Design a protein with these regions (language model features):
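Hydrophobic alpha-helical membrane-insertion segments
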Residues: 20, 29, 42-45
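Short, positively charged and aromatic/hydrophobic N-terminal segments
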Residues: 34, 43, 66-73, 81
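N-terminal helix-forming leader/targeting segments
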Residues: 1-4, 29-35
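N-terminal polybasic/positive-inside topogenic patches
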Residues: 24-25, 35-37, 50, 55, ...
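Non-heme Fe(II) oxygenase catalytic core, chiefly the N-lobe of the double-stranded beta-helix
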Residues: 80-357, 362-387
Length: 387
């Protein structure tokens, strides 16, 4: 039976009353469900292991029952027992699509992501582009299916968002220096693949990319997904006290860990990390890589230049410390923040297919690729836009 389980919101759509505060406890024996709520209309029913709210404004919120929740917990006394209660700030889980005139946006998860339909990337109109850009800022990551585009098409579409960013790792394809191949061959059993580990793209640059784009050409039949986590939602759900602590901090971003790992486990022929792996002594790295290993500082909390939305800027791969703190002081803070950002409630996951084009706001989310497709070829092409 169920001993003492807690219910946590995995998705709350637009339109749920901003005054909602709740906790849910299930107990065995009488199988009682106790609810404390305010401004929550309609009945709540138990369906399998989930509690379901009636639809409001075309949306439906679902509460998943879980044994543990790693963040956002506080303790309350209830009948002489200590009960963990999850309280999500109201209105933060709002990934509902806006009304568009020339495109259709279909949300991918409660936290972020949307599929954009009704668009041919090779012939995007000005009206469509404005709505695509708006959808990107709202959903943090958007993607298009069944696109048949050339390198010229991808470069041209990317350039509409701004100037190309400096590429940290790879050389571009012939004739298109800003379109970088991201390829893993079927016969390469890599211990480390490009993009594995939670990360922002190139945060060690003085101007990290604002937007990143990937186009899938050859996709394995199994594995090879990409997952994103919403750093803005993660920041919004922290306490005001934590906000005050984090706001003045500067984080150090460096390629140091990637270089060390690549030199240890990646073969010189493995693209695009082979350029690093080919040089086994960090002192012999090319000058441009030396600069990226040295890294730079960025604010831990950054405001989006277009929307003003505040987001955490740290990751598992490139963040090496906090300015003015010892490693012993900084590491627990950074570990907590990355764990908080990457909890499943804040993520969306994309299953690639040939012809899928995905783009994301590198300032508002982090992502990682999965190394789970050995024996199959994976070919994508990346462009990045300067921040």
């Amino acid at each position: 039976g169920i001993s003492m389980w807690m219910a946590s919101i995995w998705g709350v759509c637009a339109g749920v009353d901003s005054a909602i505060k709740h906790s849910i406890r299930l107990t065995s024996g009488a199988a009682a469900t106790r609810l404390r709520k305010r401004s929550l209309a309609g009945k709540i029913t138990l369906v399998g292991s989930a509690l379901r709210l009636p639809a409001r404004r075309g949306c439906e919120a679902e509460f998943s029952v879980n044994r543990r929740y790693n963040s956002g917990q506080m303790q309350t006394a209830d009948d002489d027992r200590r009960v963990a209660m999850i309280v999500h700030p109201a209105g933060k889980f709002d990934n509902a699509a806006c009304a568009h005139q020339s495109i259709e946006a279909v949300p991918l998860s409660a936290a972020m992501g949307a599929e954009i339909r009704g668009v041919d990337i090779s012939t995007v109109t000005d009206d469509q582009f404005q709505e695509i850009e708006s959808a990107l800022f709202r959903h943090k990551m958007i993607f298009f299916r069944d696109q048949e585009i050339s390198h010229a098409d991808q470069a041209g579409f990317s350039r509409r968002f701004g100037e190309f960013a400096e590429d940290a790792y790879t050389q571009g394809v012939a004739g298109y220096s800003d379109v970088q191949p991201v390829i893993k061959e079927a016969d390469v059993a890599a211990k480390m693949i490009f993009g594995s580990g939670w990360h922002h793209d190139a945060p060690f640059l003085e101007r990290p990319p604002a937007i990143s784009m990937l186009y899938g050409v050859d996709i394995p039949p199994i594995g090879g997904d990409t997952i994103w986590a919403n750093s803005a939602l993660a920041y919004a759900t922290l306490s005001p006290t934590m906000h005050q602590l984090l706001e003045p901090l500067m984080v150090h971003m460096s390629m140091r860990r990637v270089v060390a790992t690549a030199q240890a486990v990646v073969g010189p022929g493995d693209s695009p990390l082979g350029r690093i792996a080919a040089t086994r002594d960090v002192q012999q790295l090319p000058a441009d890589l030396e600069r990226k290993v040295a890294g730079t500082y960025h604010p831990l909390v950054r405001a989006h230049p277009r929307t003003g939305e505040r987001a955490l800027f740290c990751d598992r791969t490139y963040t090496t410390g906090i300015k003015g703190m010892t490693p012993e002081e900084a590491t627990p803070i950074l570990d907590f923040l990355v764990t908080h950002i990457t909890q499943p409630a804040f993520t969306c996951r994309l299953r690639w297919a040939p012809g899928t084009l995905a783009l994301w706001d590198n300032r508002l989310c982090i992502h990682q690729a999965f190394n789970d497709h050995d024996g199959y070829r994976r070919e994508l092409y990346r462009t990045t836009i300067a921040g």
